[in-house]
Amino acid sequence: AGDIIGVFDPGIFSIGDTICSPGHKVQFRGIPTFAPEHFALVRQKDTMKRKQFIKGTSQIAQEGAIQIFQELDAGMEEVIVGVVGVLQFDVLKYRLQNEYNCDIIMETLPYEFIRWIVNDDIDPKTLDLASDTKKIQDLKGNHLLLFTSYWSINWALEHNKGLELAEFGTN
């Protein structure tokens, strides 16, 4: 019992937002965030194009074409971009060049698996992880781990009592 409408959005709404009458409380389970399968470290070539880089990557991520991650305690100077298919890297590069006038440097990363840390009470900085595992966060502050193999996932679960990992995130 609802309508689907088109709304002009000046950047206020995100995919999955619900608009309803004031006073109505509506609660949905989050839309699953699907796990990307390919990762790259991305930064702008010209440091003077930082605003264009941030605006462009944020906009493209908001559209759902890419997911943006950061290393813990890192800024937006360089980000880890996750995609489902490698062609999305080409789309990112093209759009940043042509729509935002921002050339980028992209380095493919060896990670194949990403997992969301379910436990809110676990500090990811204290986890005992294999050397090929990277601790990251998404733009909403959720903590995640990047792995190169199933072996590394099992290592993390075996060496960190109570750690719960999810294959999908929720918004």
Residue spans for each PLM region:
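Structural and coupling elements of P-loop NTPases
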Residues: 1-171
